[in-house]
Every structure is written in C-alpha cells, then in structure tokens.
Curated annotation (Swiss-Prot):
SMART domains: DEXDc, HELICc. Residues 31-53 have a biased composition (Basic residues). Residues 1-96 are annotated as: Disordered. It comes from Meyerozyma guilliermondii (strain ATCC 6260 / CBS 566 / DSM 6381 / JCM 1539 / NBRC 10279 / NRRL Y-324) (Yeast). It is found in: Nucleus, Nucleolus. A motif (DEAD box) lies at residues 278-281. It catalyses: ATP + H2O = ADP + phosphate + H(+). Residues 8-30, 54-63 have a biased composition (Basic and acidic residues). This is ATP-dependent RNA helicase DBP3.
C-alpha cells in the first residue's frame, strides 16, 4: 500500500506526442518557403520595373536625338534657302537692311579703312556697319531723337548691329566718339516693347560728372518712351536717390554709391538685362575692380553686357574675359597703342616752372573770350590757387576739382556749357569722358602724371569730328615722360620741339603693384650690408 502511494505522489516525466513536433516543423518550413516565394516575386517585380524604366529612358533619348537631328536639318535647310539680301540672327531678330546689303563691298571697305574700324566677331555673323539711319529700324519713340544727327558715328555704326542682336560687345574708342548713344540707343530700343518691371538698364561710370553727363544723354531717349532714368552718385544725400530708384527703369551710377545702396538693401539689380561698364579702364585705374565685381554678382546672369573703354590694357581684357560671353570687340583706331586724336593740333612749350602762370595769361588773351577754353591743373590745391589768380586778373572762370561740393561742381560745369563762362579750370577729375560741347582749346598748365592722362585730357577738344587745339606747358620736372610724349606727338603727325628732344629718350620707370613707379628693385635673398657709424 505504501509503495503504491509513493508511486502516485512521485515526479513523473511526461513526454510530448511525436506528431506535435512534426506539425511545428512543417509550419516552419511552409513559412520559410512563403517568405522565399515573396522575396522572389519582389525581386522579379523590381527587375521588371527597372527594365521598363531603362526602356522608357532609351526611347526618350532616341526621340530627343531624332528631334535634335530634325531641328538641325530644318535649320540647315533654312540657311540654304535664305537670300543674300539680309543677314539676320534669331536671338533677337536683328535683320540687316536690304539697302545696306546691296551696297558694294568697296564702299564698306572704304568706311572701315577711313575710320580705322576693326570688328572681331567670334560668332562670325558678318554684320555690316550701319552707314545711315535709313539702314536701321528703331522704335518710333526713339528714331526721331536719333535722326536729328547727320549719321551714326563710327563706333555706333559698327556696334549697333551686334548690340541690337543681343550680343555682348566691347567698344574700344576715343572719348567723344558717341559711345553713350552707341550703348544707349540699342538698350532703350530693346526694352520699350516688353512690360517687365524693375530696373532694366544699369550703366556704371567712374566719376560723378560723367554719370550726370550720361544721365542727361539717356534722359533724351527715355523721356519720350515712358521710362524713368535716375543718376546714383556720392556727395549728396541717399534718401532722394533711394526714392527715385524704386520707379526707375534705367540707372546710371558710380560704383561706390551703388555698393552703398546694395549694402543697405535699397536697390535690387536682379532684373537688370543690360549692364554697361563705361570708361572701364578708368574705373580700374581708380581701384573700383572689387566694387564692379560685387555689383555684377548682383545682376541677372542672363544679362547682355556692354563695355566701353578708351584703352585696351591687360587689366581691362581680363575683366572682359571674366564677365562677358564671347564678346564682339569693336575698335576705332589702333587702341592697343596710345594714340592722340589726329584732329587736334598739339603745341608743347618747354619752360621754367616759374614762368607758367605768366604764359597762361598770355595764352588766354591770345585765344580770346569768343571760344571755350579748358585749363588743366594737376592738384586741387594748385587749382584753387590758379583760380584765385585768374579772378584777380579779370577772368570769369568756372572750376571743378575735389575741394568743391558736388553742387558747386555741377553748377560750374553747367555755367561753362551754357556759355556764361568761357573758361573752365579743372583737375583730372574732369579729364575722362566728360562731353563738354564746342571746347576749342585745352591748356595743360601742369603736365599730368602719365602720358595716358595727357591723351585723355586733350581729348576734351576735337570731339564729334571737329578740330581742336592743345597747348602744353612742359618743364624739366616731367622730363622722365618726354620720350612717351614724343611718341604721341609723332604718332599724331605733330611737331616735336627741339627743347623736348634735348631731354633725350625716355627710360621707363619700373612699376610695382604695391609700391608704384619709383621703387628700388633689390634682391631680398641677399644678406644686407652692415653700415658702421663712426
């Protein structure tokens, strides 16, 4: 009995049925097979999807290639079918007039040779220069203003076809050659018909005086077209300029003031379609390169860029290469070399510096009060002293230099233009770009720091096809510039005085980017010599 209870109450191991393990193994196997089947299906679908996508891309690529080939064939056919009476470009629809195309090539060659016109066209468009206003179709609101002039100037004739066509253009020509209308007419003409808002045309110039002059010329074009032109420059309060620029379509600005307005968030240049850099070489000389780069960076990347310059040095070439797209270069005369206007009679007198003011008074009385005379001093302090001397001598003189306010300078310039005063005294602030009509005589009281500035100074006379006189008082202090001056005189067919020849050839000073033209070039790798003081 006891043994039976022990058996009943003891631990007994209970084994699971065999068929339960088999069921579990079967389910696991089915689950695995199901998973593999699903993965296989997904892999197949993924492969089919990829093949379908590749097939679609292949077909699209094929269609695109066929479409391109068809388009090229069509264009080739159109070129073959086009008549020789016109030369056109599809970029903005400029079509060379049939009358211009009909002119004999000899007449075109004569114009190019007589005016020393050179066109470097990377697009090979082959546009002929516009010899008459009848050869160009301008908007009706602009044409009456332009046709008041007898005919286009050489820079206008050669550049207009490319500018109207929408190409980037570099114009290299002497000051007073009609450059403002060369870029102004195509720019205004091209924006009249569209309804785009905001600033459309931006012209950057190196000085306030030049900016105001360009503003006056462009206003002649914009006032009849329902467009507003404003001038932005330093020396006056910003408030009025900020207010005016909000409704403007055309802006003429000096780099410094424009950068100020950009930094203030007062002007938006993203809508600019036409960017003009006028007197580009002068702006680089004045150290505006970084400002120019900042300004250009704020404009529309699809803009048309125009650059006008009196000279074509390496720095200007590099600037053009950076910001312009396959620019057409139009040159009037040999602008790679420094050359003076051949219509100007140049006289150089070598003298004692102490005799200059006496000689100036003699020249002013000699040339009389019936013609406009422009006298150049080198520094503003000199200009102030000479102005006082001329007033004491009974001359009604107007003056523009750095010591005067912008209002005083503008008033003086206007007085000279109107003829209230026939004598203007200026420093080099007025030496470039200013279009002062009917200046007959330029007198260099003090020779400038460079022969380049000399050429720009005397370029104030002999403008727009007229003749002029340049009288220069030269001293021994400037003898290091005698050789370069003699080259300019000879190049323009002018006599070289014996006194100037006595200074001999010109040994060009070495120039350093940081230290200027008068530094001493030494080898910094050599050990310095010891100097003992007794």
């Amino acid at each position: 009995m006891g043994s039976k209870r022990k058996h009943e109450s003891g631990d007994v191991e209970v084994k699971k049925p065999k068929h339960d393990n088999e069921v579990k193994g079967k389910e696991k196997k089915e689950k695995k097979e199901k998973k593999e089947k699903k993965e296989k299906k997904e892999k197949k679908e993924k492969k089919e999807k990829k093949e379908k996508k590749e097939k679609k891309e292949k077909n699209e690529k094929k269609e695109k290639k066929e479409k391109k080939a068809k388009k090229e064939k069509t264009e080739e056919t159109e070129e073959t079918d086009s008549t020789v009476s016109t030369v056109s470009s599809s970029s903005s629809g400029y079509t060379q007039a049939a009358e211009l195309t009909a002119l004999p090539q000899s007449e075109i060659d004569e114009f190019l040779q007589t005016n020393e016109v050179t066109v470097e066209d990377p697009h090979k468009l082959g546009f002929r220069p516009i010899l008459s206003f009848d050869h160009v179709q301008l908007q009706s609101k602009i044409a009456p203003i332009v046709t008041k002039f007898p005919k286009p100037t050489p820079i206008q004739s050669a550049s207009w076809p490319y500018l109207l066509n929408g190409d980037d253009v570099v114009g290299v020509a002497e000051t007073g050659s009609g450059k403002t209308f060369a870029f102004g007419v195509p720019a205004i003409n091209n924006i009249i018909t569209d309804n785009k808002k905001g600033l459309r045309v931006l012209c950057i110039s190196p000085t306030r005086e030049l900016a105001l002059q360009i503003y006056d010329n462009l206003t002649m074009l914009t006032k009849n077209c329902g467009l507003t032109c404003v001038a932005i420059y330093g020396g006056v309060p910003k408030d009025q300029q900020i207010k005016a620029v909000k409704t403007a379509s055309v802006v003429v600005a000096t780099p410094g003031r424009l950068v100020d307005l950009l930094n203030d968030g007062a002007v938006d240049l993203s809508t600019i379609d036409y960017l003009v850099l006028d007197e580009a070489d002068r702006m680089l000389e004045k150290g505006f390169e970084e400002d120019i780069k900042n300004i250009i960076g704020c404009t529309n990347k699809q803009r048309q860029t125009l650059m006008f310059t009196a000279t074509w040095p390496k720095e200007v070439r590099e600037l053009a290469a950076t910001f312009m797209n396959k620019a057409v270069k139009v040159s009037i005369g040999n602008r790679d070399e420094l050359a003076a206007n051949k219509r100007i009679t140049q006289t150089v007198e070598v003298m004692d510096p102490r005799d200059k003011e006496r000689r100036l008074l003699q020249l002013l009385r000699q040339y009389g009060s019936d013609q406009k005379i422009l006298v150049f001093a080198l520094y503003k302090k000199e200009a102030t002293r000479v102005e006082a001397m001329l007033r004491r001598s009974g001359f009604n003189v107007a003056a523009i230099h750095g010591d005067l306010s912008q209002q005083q300078r503008t008033s003086a310039l206007d007085s000279f233009k109107r003829g209230d005063s026939n004598l203007l005294l200026a420093t080099d602030v007025a030496a470039r770009g200013l279009d002062i009509p009917n200046v007959k005589v330029v007198i260099n009281l003090t020779f400038p720091l460079t022969v380049e500035d000399y050429v720009h100074r005397i370029g104030r006379t002999g403008r727009a096809g007229q003749t002029g006189i340049a009288h220069t008082l030269f001293t021994e202090h400037e003898k290091h510039l005698s050789g370069a001056l003699m080259n300019v005189l000879r190049g323009a067919g002018q006599p070289v005085p014996d006194e100037l020849l006595k200074f001999g050839g010109h040994t060009k000073k070495k120039s350093h980017s940081a230290y200027g033209a008068f530094f001493k070039d030494v080898d910094m790798t050599k050990t310095a010599k010891k100097i003992k003081f007794e």
